[in-house]
Regions:
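Bacterial Sec-dependent N-terminal signal peptides
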Residues: 1-25
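Alpha-helical interaction segments
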Residues: 4-6, 34-36, 44, 91-94
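Sec-dependent signal peptide cleavage junction
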Residues: 17-44
């Protein structure tokens, strides 16, 4: 009987901790939203974005690997935020990481912001648009050694491509 009581207590304590964590994350998200230059309601974002773009940019979702139209794009130009049009990555920074997501070895400085993400149980560096706060992806330290050593693993749904003028 003591065993069952202990198990129930452990489960109850675990649920309480998760509930408090979610509240803290929500408060943090609200604070971050106030800091962005482009702020829109959820309804406004839904009207402007596709379902997948909304899921990735506004709900910090992840598109399926290999599904991005930009994965094999070799054209010269700039990748901009699909939410607000802020230039984020230049095509010259793009490389084939073999991960299934568009990858870049660096961002356009000042236009991408970083935060810590523990959503899957361990620490990762999340990237988001510095202007509208849209979730872009994550940055890892396993990129090309001959450049920055970084791999910005980006959801193609978070991007639009603007070809270089010829």
């Amino acid at each position: 009987m003591k065993k069952y009581v202990c198990i129930i207590l452990l489960i109850a304590m675990g649920c309480k901790g998760v509930s408090q964590e979610k509240e803290a994350v929500t408060e943090k998200e609200e604070e971050q939203t106030e800091a962005f230059k482009v702020v829109k309601s959820e309804e406004e974002w839904r009207k402007e974005l596709t379902e997948l773009q909304f899921y990735v940019l506004r709900k910090a979702g992840t598109e399926n690997p290999g599904s991005s139209e930009f994965l094999k794009n070799k054209m010269a130009g700039t990748y901009v935020c699909a939410g607000c049009g802020t230039p984020l990555f230049k095509s010259e920074y793009k490389f084939d990481s073999g991960t299934g997501w568009p990858s870049f070895d660096r961002e356009i400085e000042g236009n991408v912001a970083f935060d810590v993400d523990y959503k899957i149980g361990y620490k990762r560096t999340e990237e988001h648009c510095a202007v509208c706060g849209g979730h872009l992806g994550h940055v890892f330290e396993d990129g090309p050694r001959e450049t920055t050593g970084l791999r910005h693993c980006i959801n193609g749904a978070a991007l639009r491509f603007v070809p270089e003028e010829q």
